[in-house]
Every structure is written in C-alpha cells, then in structure tokens.
Curated annotation (Swiss-Prot):
The keyword Nuclease does not apply. It holds the Pfam family Cys_Knot_tox. It comes from Apomastus schlingeri (Trap-door spider). The keyword Secreted applies. This is U1-cyrtautoxin-As1a.
Length: 74
C-alpha cells in the first residue's frame, strides 16, 4: 500500500492552541481543522483535517494534511 502524501515536508508554523497543546503536524490524528498547524506559505498551501483510509486499522481516520491549493488532491 502506498502511503498518501500528507505534506510532512512542507514547512509549517508550530503554534500553541487555546487548550495549551501544540498544533498537530501533517500525518497526526485530528478531529478538526483548527488543531492542525498551518503552512508557512498560506498562499500556496492549505492545511486542514481530512479523512484518510488507514489500511493498518482497516477504517477511515482523520489526519492533518497540508497540500498545494492548485493540486486536484487538495
């Protein structure tokens, strides 16, 4: 199974969330977009929490993802 590119190589801004925890990086499990770190280049890249298939778990999971806004995969 080929792992999906979740944008882990794209520079992002590490910020503390209102709950005191650090934002989650691409590939981390999430429940909402606000938990995910934003890309440094917010014009070129979009960040969010998206549903991905996990072959390991045999179910869908939500993971932080950063992708190019011009990509059809974003």
């Amino acid at each position: 199974e080929i792992a999906q590119n979740l944008g882990s190589g794209i520079p992002h801004i590490r910020t503390k969330l209102p709950n005191g925890q650090w934002c989650k990086t691409p590939g981390d499990l999430c429940s909402s977009r606000s938990e995910c770190c934003k890309a440094e280049d917010s014009v070129t890249y979009s960040s969010g929490c998206s549903r991905q298939w996990s072959g390991q778990q045999g179910t869908f999971i939500n993971q932080c993802r950063t992708c190019n806004v011009e990509s059809s995969m974003c």
